[in-house]
Amino acid sequence: MRAVLTVAAAVLAARPVAADPTESRVLTAPTAWLPPSGAATATLGIDHRGDTAVFAGASLDGLAELEIDEDSDVRGCTDCAMQRTPLRLGRAGFRIGAHQDWLHGMPALVLGVRATFAAYEPAVDAPRVTDAYVVASRDLGVVRLHAGVDALAASVADHRSAAALRPLAGVELHPPMYPRSSLLGDLAWEPELDAVHGPVLRWMLGIGVRYQAFSWGSVELAVRARQGDDLGGATVMARFNAIARR
């Protein structure tokens, strides 16, 4: 019992990793962290297949954030039993929320929405994805926890799906002996756009590490597995995150 109390005290008392850029996502799952007033964020990523991702965000007085990104997280197919093709989509989002301890003991809370505004050389006709989510995040020192719910809707060709609720979860572990390093894990969802049968939601599990290389930037290396893929279908990716403060 004494050992359990000692570990619990260490978790609650340990200081968070210093100078950590304010990340709006763990790996794929969103967080409730918002950048400080006047800050701008950017992420550049590439995976082992050569697919790239670009993200940019701008703070609105520290209470909200505008986002724009281009990635290939969504898959599309005309015969999903044979091949699922990454779809490069441009998406824009808006997030608004409250910071941690706005009321004593309260986690950070964010309401976010995101919608497709462009599709680049899509393998299927008229792909679109829209989602709205609520996420709570809490910094406990060596551990940061994230939990929420996502309402996703998608359409492809003449098929449209109604919004469906799915859980979101994430964890960041900051070992005190490695103050610049973090272990990351999350659960998120993206649609598979089947041009024949319509959209289907698929879970994505991610695990990775983040290294705080600079006070303004961090490097991530991660592996993501997607529902329906075998081990060879897992994605290995590297990302660089940066934040500019006013």
Tell where the protein language model's regions lie, with residue ranges.
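Hydrophobic h-region of N-terminal signal peptides that target proteins for export
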Residues: 4-18
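Outer-membrane beta-barrel biogenesis signature
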Residues: 15-43, 172, 176, 181, ...
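Outer-membrane beta-barrel domain signature
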Residues: 29-31, 41-45, 79-85, 119-125, ...
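Repeated loop/turn-to-beta-strand initiation elements of outer-membrane beta-barrel proteins
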Residues: 39-41, 62-68, 101-109, 142-147, ...
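Membrane-embedded beta-strand positions in outer-membrane beta-barrel channels/transporters
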Residues: 41, 53-55, 91-95, 133-135, ...
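Transmembrane beta-strands of outer-membrane beta-barrel pores
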Residues: 46-50, 60-62, 68-76, 98-100, ...
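Outer-membrane pore/translocation modules
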Residues: 68-165, 169
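Outer-membrane beta-barrel "beta-signal"
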Residues: 92-94, 211-212, 230-246
